[in-house]
């Protein structure tokens, strides 16, 4: 499930003052890549190959890649959406999606360092997830990868999880969007994998989601309008550090790598 010949749309940082620019990625390696500068991110309609050929080419380094959508209006996250993860967390299979929100300030680039204040780092955890990016008219524009970074001690202070899911610049998001016209991770049975310092922790097909992406779009649309660029983060499979015996939380210097077949991978090092 290579993405080499599949359109990939990302966002790069042009400078340190928060200037962003969407690009169509044409090549990429660990060091960086090249892409075509776009006037706007293609949430609404696809860019043709003829249009891309006429656009200026830009080179970029890996650390210039920002959150694939830098400032989404809404980010809905889903908890407890894989049966094995539900079991390891000790919950029954839900009748309806368990939803919480993440703010845009919690997003990080796909290769950014994640800085966790020492007083907030006691139970830092990873959650590899498939993320959905919305287009127009309630349609899914494409798919990407997210680490729903979690602070378990804060998450479980109350029955509401928000305070354990929104640390500033903590959730790696990217590296790019693969359009739904070219790739369906559910139909393809794409496998999500998470490694911590090279050790495989999560490995599961996203086809096993209890509530599939379109189910989530339909459910959320009952009470909220989904606009182009809004994000739905679909949940994590079993293998999180909190569910291990004993729990294995993230520590200073740990590298979390998350990959989904047919989309790409993100890598974030923890600094606490």
Indicate residue ranges for each PLM-predicted region.
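N-terminal non-catalytic cap/leader segment that marks the start of a structured domain
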Residues: 1-97, 257
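Short loop segments at secondary-structure junctions
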Residues: 105, 135-138, 149, 180-183, ...
